[in-house]
From Swiss-Prot:
Localisation: Cell membrane
Cell division recorded as keyword: no
Family the entry assigns: Belongs to the ATPase alpha/beta chains family.
Name assigned to this protein: ATP synthase subunit beta
Alphabetical keyword list: ATP synthesis, ATP-binding, Cell membrane, CF(1), Hydrogen ion transport, Ion transport, Membrane, Nucleotide-binding, Translocase, Transport
Lineage: Bacteria, Bacillati, Bacillota, Bacilli, Lactobacillales
Subunit structure as annotated in this protein's UniProt entry: F-type ATPases have 2 components, CF(1) - the catalytic core - and CF(0) - the membrane proton channel. CF(1) has five subunits: alpha(3), beta(3), gamma(1), delta(1), epsilon(1). CF(0) has three main subunits: a(1), b(2) and c(9-12). The alpha and beta chains form an alternating ring which encloses part of the gamma chain. CF(1) is attached to CF(0) by a central stalk formed by the gamma and epsilon chains, while a peripheral stalk is formed by the delta and b chains.
GO MF term set: ATP binding; ATP hydrolysis activity; proton-transporting ATP synthase activity, rotational mechanism
Gene name of this polypeptide: atpD
Cited HAMAP family: ATP_synth_beta_bact
Top-level taxonomic group: Bacteria
E.C. designation(s): 7.1.2.2
Reaction catalysed by this enzyme: ATP + H2O + 4 H(+)(in) = ADP + phosphate + 5 H(+)(out)
Purpose of the protein: Produces ATP from ADP in the presence of a proton gradient across the membrane. The catalytic sites are hosted primarily by the beta subunits.
Length: 468
């Protein structure tokens, strides 16, 4: 194990000098530096650049407070390695695989794997056309998720990405079992804490591994924590042959941390100040999130859209890797429609008659047609009022409004805020409900009866309570 000495510390960037005869550590190797003489407080550094003349530039995974010039640095000879396997289930840990849930730390002999790996080769990949039922009507009907696919939840600040991810974790864990890995990348610690206790209460935590690198941590940790979560998911897929769910909240923070690291390393920024290696970094992460012949990884990624601008390089780069996109729209939150999923902007490769079936496809496309026509008529209604519409158009507007409200539903994870029980709606019930609305079966029921309900039977009960 070769050793060097700290030459300079600039925030999270640490330059380390190795003696001229020593072998320099490789890029991505983990280096260890002890803050104190009794070797209780260590900091892990990751090699990012070789500057020449025995000097390497590293990024710290923890705060560099207390580091001084001249401290000894040890090369571990390998990349950061994290615990994998069944021992990780029910536990919460950081980017380095250290437990942060106040329970017993992992044993020394636990299986560990490096966080940097190659993506599976082309001949190992497998594709599936099986739908993953989520119990959320708007998703299952208009932008269904594929088992083993990649899903992006796009939205600006405060439109409900994290709540939607939490509901998906709840529904999929309760209905499908299976193993989940939740990776919190640069998000709020409070939300992670809430999620942990919720999962503990519901018993879902026993089948979930949780990894966090939150907002307050150095950019190195936020940039690498997604790889830590992915490494755990890959082990369950490749070694145990499991179907794994990988939740990442938020993939934009991964890009943001990469941008900070890039600037600290002195690279010239690219478009909108992002790192020049944006597409490469995103590609290296996303290409590893895939399904092989041994098992599948279905990934659901929240993607923050800065200033609601979808042309921003960060969300635009992520778009290219996804099978399904669920777009959250601020206008819908203002109308009180939750989840605020835009039914026309959201899309899925799975919405085809070969995968979802003829009836589902026909109902979904008709729902989109009615909503699109309603959107076109809104300008006329705003200027001239409803009276200028033909009878046929008035009927269409009535149905479109009922459909728009029926696309909303109460969430189990939001019950503590709304006081209303959440609902899980099977795909067959979702398709039947929308088909009957399109047929005009419920034209007489008030629009408000369709708001925030589960299956169509709930609408009828709500209308009866309202006196219809």
């Amino acid at each position: 194990m070769s050793s060097g000495k700290i030459a300079q510390v600039v925030g999270p960037v640490v330059d380390v000098m190795f003696a001229s005869g020593d072998k320099l550590p490789e890029i991505n190797n983990a280096l260890i530096v002890y803050k104190d003489s009794d070797k209780k407080q260590k900091i892990v550094l990751e090699v990012a650049l070789e500057l020449g003349d025995g000097m390497v530039r590293t990024i710290a995974m923890e705060s560099t407070d207390g580091l001084t010039r001249g401290l000894e640095v040890l090369d571990t000879g390998r990349a950061i390695s994290v615990p994998v396997g069944k021992e990780t289930l029910g536990r919460v840990f950081n980017v380095l695989g250290e437990t942060i849930d106040l329970e017993e730390p992992f044993a020394e002999d636990v299986d560990r794997q490096p966080i940097h790996k190659k993506a599976p080769s082309f001949d190992e990949l497998s594709t599936s056309s099986e739908i993953l039922e989520t119990g959320i009507k708007v998703i299952d009907l208009l932008a269904p998720y594929l088992k083993g696919g990649k899903v992006g939840l796009f939205g600006g600040a405060g439109v409900g990405k994290t709540v939607l991810i939490q509901e998906l974790i709840h529904n999929i864990a309760q209905e499908h079992g299976g193993i989940s890995v939740f990776t919190g990348v640069g998000e709020r610690t409070r939300e992670g804490n809430d999620l942990y206790w919720e999962m503990k209460e519901s018993g879902v935590i026993e089948k979930t591994a949780m990894v966090f690198g939150q907002m307050n941590e150095p950019p190195g940790a936020r940039m690498r924590v997604a790889l830590t979560g992915l490494t755990i998911a890959e082990y369950f897929r490749d070694v145990e042959g499991q179907d794994v769910l990988l939740f990442i909240d938020n993939i934009f923070r991964f890009t943001q941390a990469g941008s900070e690291v890039s600037a600290l390393l002195g690279r010239m920024p690219s478009a909108v100040g992002y790192q020049p290696t944006l597409a490469t970094e995103m590609g290296q992460l996303q290409e590893r999130i895939t399904s092989t012949q041994k098992g599948s990884v279905t990934s659901i990624q929240a993607i923050y859209v800065p200033a609601d601008d979808y042309t921003d390089p960060a969300p635009a780069t992520a778009f290219a890797h996804l099978d399904s996109t669920t777009n959250l729209e601020r206008k819908l939150t203002q109308m009180g429609i939750y989840p605020a999923v835009d039914p026309l902007a959201s899309s899925s490769r799975a919405l085809s008659p070969e995968i979802v079936g003829e009836e589902h496809y026909a109902v979904a496309t008709e729902v989109q047609r009615v909503l699109q026509r309603y959107r076109e008529l809104q300008d006329i209604i705003a200027i001239l009022g409803m009276d200028e519409l033909s009878d046929e158009e008035k009927t269409l507007v009535g149905r479109a409004r009922r459909i728009q409200f029926f696309l909303s539903q109460n969430f189990n994870v939001a019950e503590q805020f709304t006081g209303l029980p959440g609902s899980y709606v099977p795909v067959a019930d979702t398709v039947r409900g929308f088909k009957e609305i399109l047929e005009g079966k419920y034209d007489e029921l008030p629009e408000d009866a369709f708001r925030s309900v589960g299956p169509i039977e709930d609408v009828i009960k709500k209308a009866e309570k309202m006196g219809f």
